[in-house]
């Protein structure tokens, strides 16, 4: 066999890890065994909007996968009430275990029964994984015993006796609680191989920061950014406009816990400024939306702060629009179109009276200019966002594990829309002198979003990238926005409902056509009946009969209303998607009451499941992206074995096994 210099150089590098024929052959055999296993389960969630309790419950339950496995393994011999208790124990072991223990008359017997049930369940869940993979999922401090309990063979000894003796030792030495908790964590870890979050972790919900903590602890997760995410990314990067934008949403819902409690960002200077500047203003239009889960506090103070940041946001929007003609947002720099003496705004050729004419910080001769006090507030907030270590860790995680879109195992994942023309062609959007559409546009947006955080501080490239992050939040042709405008100004200042309409991109009309879904998949290099688009962003109005399944089954929108504010609009509390070795399952969830009720009343989220794609045969690891990479490694290892055997590369010294 002839070897190119480059191929030989690569094989020599590979030989450093696999130093003998035996080592390379053993790895080939191990990989071939792995490739024959069923593919792991993938779990898709979208549009979490800060609803951390519902998110954590669905994450812990794997969208009902764990309860299904409990019913499969224990359904014949264990009452439904006890299966529900076991499910809650697995979801919330640290909280549920003390409650269950307190109820027991014979704690020793309960420990034994619970450990045996968890062993059976864990053996079942681990059956589609190699033993090596399962071992790597086990905690170090008790991994050996867990491995023995999961993989013991009973040809030579009695199963009940073997388990019984180990369990007796665990109970005798007061380790039962620790082993129960470890089994629960391992079951959750093995039930789902990979988690996909299709955008919008942030928004009005109480604690998006806690969602990110959970994601950072997850074993394998990827994120497709949503419009609410990129504006927080811009805020963390140092964009004053993105900061005012996230503050406006936060104050509109009186959700200061995320900023002050979660990220340690003080709003005291802003509060003092707002209380002084708008002391005599009517702020009734600026009162926060009610949410019983957020601290009430001084609602009038919150309203003044809400108005203060909105005015600063409008000024900064006008500045960004002026320095970015590419954005094509002229006309949305509203402060430049207000007649302050008359109290009216020229809205794209129509004059409207303003609902609020009080602008004490605006200079009619230069309406986009911040006052000296506003400049100080903006500078302090930029510094506070930059110095929040937790926020910076979270945003770095979003950049490291996130992207504008992802292709995984034949599926295409993105949050918003692929901009289209009225006739269904990909819309060409011009930035920096070049028109881009489809995949090229997505790749460009990904690069510019990263530029806003990673370009050198103070550089023109970083400033331009931060402006672009804001554009992605609300721009008329932003794939993450997918609408003609974000009508924040219109809803606050103009009474006419016609001005408040946000027109959806033609994409949302065309995705009903299977040809559109197939066209998008081809644009990203995907094809075949097993390829699907997983989309978020726009709540599906299930209550009105709308289906989340579009394009002849090729596109699935999984935003069904995680956000509590959308429950009345959608009639449900969200969709999740499960992709296992047999196909794609869409789960429709009803509203989640609370973690407290789930723990103490074993109340699970009511869900219904629907197979939307059934694979013609069971999907194996060899059929996945990882399988393709493993098969490429087998080819390389086979070439290495041949190089050893032909004397082209010398074998190393065999290591003792």
What are these regions (language model features)?
Residues 1-657:
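Feature recognizes metal-dependent phosphohydrolase scaffolds
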